[in-house]
Regions:
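Cyclophilin-like peptidyl-prolyl cis-trans isomerases
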Residues: 2-8, 16-199
Length: 199
């Protein structure tokens, strides 16, 4: 009788264990999220270490080191992108670690994101291996920035998950020359008060 009772319960127990395992796996795979608090409002991004592991590790280390706190969006181009993470409000360039390896092609090959509206990508110079701390958020679909067999493109490693209206507000601010920049700098600084890992 006891054996029969256990046999009847066995499928339910197996299902419960399976559900618990799936839940654990889902939690383990959940993307890290970073909250940016700015003087224009807050927004949250999530990043994908399974697609661009070195880039995400680099970015999150800068977050943990408080590198982004007090930096500005120094390059804002409506109908293109908003860029920040490299200069403070006095337009002094912040020190960075060594560049991170470019992962754009590898990320796309793993099913990563393209440079679509709301995506987060690494900024760099003309040297594909020069990305350090600066990032940009696409405010339109910018397919010409995507990696290809002929071009390295720009590594996309995350996207905005909440507060996109703040990015829309930032992209529309009046811009002009400021600091070392001849154009595209907000006339009223857009300051990142803090960048915090929330998961």
């Amino acid at each position: 009788m006891k054996f029969r009772s256990f046999s009847a319960l066995a499928p339910a127990l197996i299902a419960l264990v399976a559900m618990f395992s799936v839940a654990q796996e889902t939690l383990a795979q959940e993307a890290p999220r970073v909250k940016f608090a700015t003087n224009a409002g807050d927004f949250v991004v999530e990043v994908y270490p399974d697609k661009a592991p070195k880039t995400v590790e680099n970015f999150l280390q800068y977050v943990k080191d408080k590198h982004y706190d007090g930096t500005i969006f120094h390059r804002v181009i409506d109908n293109f992108m908003v860029q920040g993470g490299g200069f403070d409000a006095r337009y002094s360039e912040k020190k960075t670690r060594a560049p991170v390896a470019h992962e754009g092609r590898e990320a796309l090959a793993k099913g990563g994101l393209k440079n679509l509206v709301g995506t987060l990508a690494m900024a760099r110079t003309n040297d594909p291996q020069s990305a350090t701390a600066q990032f940009f958020i696409n405010v339109k679909d910018n397919a010409f920035l995507d990696p290809s067999t002929q071009d390295f493109g720009y590594t996309v490693f995350g996207k905005v998950t909440s507060g996109m209206e703040v990015i829309q507000k930032i992209k529309a601010v009046p811009t002009g020359p400021a600091g070392p920049f001849g154009s595209d700098a907000p006339k009223t600084p857009i300051i990142i008060n803090s960048a915090t890992l929330v998961k």
